[in-house]
Every structure is written in structure tokens, then in C-alpha cells.
Amino acid sequence: MITISDAAQAHFVNLLADQPEGTHIRVFVISPGTATAECGVSYCPPDAVEADDMELEYNGFNAMVDEKSAPFLEDATIDFVTDQLGSQLTLKAPNAKMRKVASDASLNERIEYVIQSEINPQLASHGGNIMLLEVTEDGVAILQFGGGCNGCSMVDVTLKDGIEKQLLEMFPGELTGVKDATEHQAGDHSYQ
């Protein structure tokens, strides 16, 4: 479920050595399955362990995961990276904002998953996002741009060279194209 690198495991063992006996770590997701989902790691004293917690065993410590967070932490990784600027703990949870969809899910569900987990996080750096409106019978995904993407002068490049290329590679034989249905209006909200 959660892959913790050897360096991160050693880091947790060192941190827990200064805590009361029986203290674990807790890995959790706040607002799982939403665009505002955030992951975190905290200490979990013995009296904070819940009956429905999932207990994961690692080298020298255990990690607790609450029942609600568990499906959103599937394929999560925790690493401890050291470079010239110092060291930091990184937690990557690709399914925190949206649960991974089954391989037999509908085309719309699979496209929506890619949009929420891969494309929108990239567009968010410009304050933008996209939404899937529909997939036509001839396999064209109809999208609507929002936020900073609405009215952006680079929207056509983003659509054709970025989003369409990515989606066609991921869904060969199922998608034939991508079209923008947005009525673009440049304004203060538009990315420049």
C-alpha cells in the first residue's frame, strides 16, 4: 500500500526514538477524494490508535492508516531526500485527490481520473483546470477550460500539444480527438 524508502524508514526510527514507548506514525489524507486533498504524517501515540486503523509494519516501527484514508493512499510513496540545501521528507500519493479507477471502468471514468490526477495538477500552477463534459460517439473528448485557462492566449497549444497528445497516447483506439467547448473570455483571471 505505502512504500517507504529505507532512508525514510531510518528517519522515522530516529524520530520515534525520542517519543514515548509504543508511539507509531500515522499517515493520513485530509479531505480525501477532493481537489483540496492533503496528505500528512504525524506521531500516533498508543492511545490514539483506532479499532478500524490499518497497521502497516516497517523496519523498527509501524504506521497507522485510518479506514477513510486507506484507499486514497494506494500506491503512495514516502522518501527522505538529502541534498546540498538540507533534507526533507516527501510523501507522494497519486490517488489522494481521486481513487484509482478499475481497469474495466468506463472510458469517461478513466479520462476523468487522468484529468484529476495528472492534468489538473499541472494546470493548477497557472490557476487553471479542465473538466470533461462528454465523450462523443465518434470518440472525441469535449473539454471545458476554467480558472486561469479561460481566456489564456496559450490555450490552443495547451489543448493540442499537451492535453490531446497525452489523452490520445493513454487511450489509443478509444479516443479520436479532443475539443474545447469553452467560451473563452480574457480577463484578470486569465493566465498571461
Curated annotation (Swiss-Prot):
<dbReference type="InterPro" id="IPR001075">
    <property type="entry name" value="NIF_FeS_clus_asmbl_NifU_C"/>
</dbReference>
<dbReference type="InterPro" id="IPR034904">
    <property type="entry name" value="FSCA_dom_sf"/>
</dbReference>
<dbReference type="InterPro" id="IPR000361">
    <property type="entry name" value="FeS_biogenesis"/>
</dbReference>
<dbReference type="GO" id="GO:0005506">
    <property type="term" value="F:iron ion binding"/>
</dbReference>
<comment type="similarity">
    <text>Belongs to the NfuA family.</text>
</comment>
<dbReference type="GO" id="GO:0051539">
    <property type="term" value="F:4 iron, 4 sulfur cluster binding"/>
</dbReference>
<protein>
    <recommendedName>
        <fullName>Fe/S biogenesis protein NfuA</fullName>
    </recommendedName>
</protein>
<keyword id="KW-0479">Metal-binding</keyword>
<dbReference type="GO" id="GO:0051604">
    <property type="term" value="P:protein maturation"/>
</dbReference>
<dbReference type="Pfam" id="PF01106">
    <property type="entry name" value="NifU"/>
</dbReference>
<dbReference type="Pfam" id="PF01521">
    <property type="entry name" value="Fe-S_biosyn"/>
</dbReference>
<comment type="subunit">
    <text>Homodimer.</text>
</comment>
<feature type="binding site">
    <location>
        <position position="149"/>
    </location>
    <ligand>
        <name>[4Fe-4S] cluster</name>
    </ligand>
</feature>
<keyword id="KW-0411">Iron-sulfur</keyword>
<keyword id="KW-0004">4Fe-4S</keyword>
<dbReference type="InterPro" id="IPR035903">
    <property type="entry name" value="HesB-like_dom_sf"/>
</dbReference>
<comment type="function">
    <text>Involved in iron-sulfur cluster biogenesis. Binds a 4Fe-4S cluster, can transfer this cluster to apoproteins, and thereby intervenes in the maturation of Fe/S proteins. Could also act as a scaffold/chaperone for damaged Fe/S proteins.</text>
</comment>
<dbReference type="InterPro" id="IPR017726">
    <property type="entry name" value="Fe/S_biogenesis_protein_NfuA"/>
</dbReference>
<feature type="binding site">
    <location>
        <position position="152"/>
    </location>
    <ligand>
        <name>[4Fe-4S] cluster</name>
    </ligand>
</feature>
<dbReference type="GO" id="GO:0016226">
    <property type="term" value="P:iron-sulfur cluster assembly"/>
</dbReference>
<keyword id="KW-0408">Iron</keyword>
